[in-house]
Curated annotation (Swiss-Prot):
InterPro entries: Allergen/soft/tryp_amyl_inhib (IPR006106), Bifun_inhib/LTP/seed_sf (IPR036312), Bifunc_inhib/LTP/seed_store (IPR016140), Glia_glutenin (IPR001954)
Variant or mutagenesis effect after changing G75S: Found in hard wheats, including cv. Buster and cv. Shamrock
Record bears the keyword Signal: yes
tRNA processing is among the record's keywords: no
Propeptide: 20-29
Family matches, as Gene3D superfamilies: Plant lipid-transfer and hydrophobic proteins (1.10.110.10)
Organism field: Triticum aestivum (Wheat)
This protein's name: Puroindoline-B
GO molecular function: nutrient reservoir activity; serine-type endopeptidase inhibitor activity; toxin activity
SMART domains (UniProt xref): AAI
Gene Ontology terms: biological process: defense response to bacterium
Taxonomic lineage of the native organism: Eukaryota, Viridiplantae, Streptophyta, Embryophyta, Tracheophyta
Function summary: Acts as a membranotoxin, probably through its antibacterial and antifungal activities, contributing to the defense mechanism of the plant against predators. Forms monovalent cation-selective ion channels in membranes. Has antibacterial activity against the Gram-positive bacteria S.aureus and C.michiganensis, and the Gram-negative bacteria E.coli, P.syringae pv phaseoli, A.tumefaciens and E.carotovora subsp carotovora. Acts synergistically with PINA against bacteria. Contributes to grain texture and hardness.
Any one Pfam family match given in the protein's UniProt record, by short name: Tryp_alpha_amyl
Length: 148
């Protein structure tokens, strides 16, 4: 019974933390690297290749069926996925790029109670470095504490 109570309490704390995070719209604009939410469209941008790049997924038609993650660490398609990401990112206004990247990866990062913390940190760093990897300016800056 105590275990059930503790699990319920833990779930409540986790959902409250997430609700507080969701209520703070535009929180990272003050940190820098992102531009204001008022200037950027609120719909989710088409950055599927960037999401694949950040999550280290290898999706290319020549490798069909999907060959991730084995080809990824061999360097098989990382370059192709990054190039597609850069092309998609170039279609977004410079002041909106970091906000768009953050919105695309926002629901993808994490793990229950920080179980995947090391992996999340690596993916977060990868996401933040996208603009510089694409020669489109400085890295984004996201407050990492909100993801775990």
């Amino acid at each position: 019974m105590k275990t059930l109570f503790l699990l319920a309490l833990l779930a409540l704390v986790a959902s409250t933390t997430f609700a507080q995070y969701s209520e703070v719209g535009g929180w990272y604009n003050e940190v820098g690297g992102g531009g204001g939410s008022q200037q950027c469209p609120q719909e989710r941008p088409k950055l599927s290749s960037c999401k694949d790049y950040v999550m280290e997924r290898c999706f290319t038609m020549k490798d069909f069926p999907v060959t991730w993650p084995t080809k990824w660490w061999k360097g098989g398609c990382e370059h192709e996925v990054r190039e597609k990401c850069c092309k998609q990112l170039s279609q977004i206004a410079p002041q909106c790029r970091c906000d768009s990247i953050r919105r695309v990866i926002q629901g993808r990062l994490g793990g229950f109670l920080g179980i995947w913390r090391g992996e999340v940190f690596k993916q977060l760093q990868r996401a933040q470095s996208l603009p510089s990897k694409c020669n489109m300016g400085a890295d984004c800056k996201f407050p990492s504490g909100y993801y775990w």
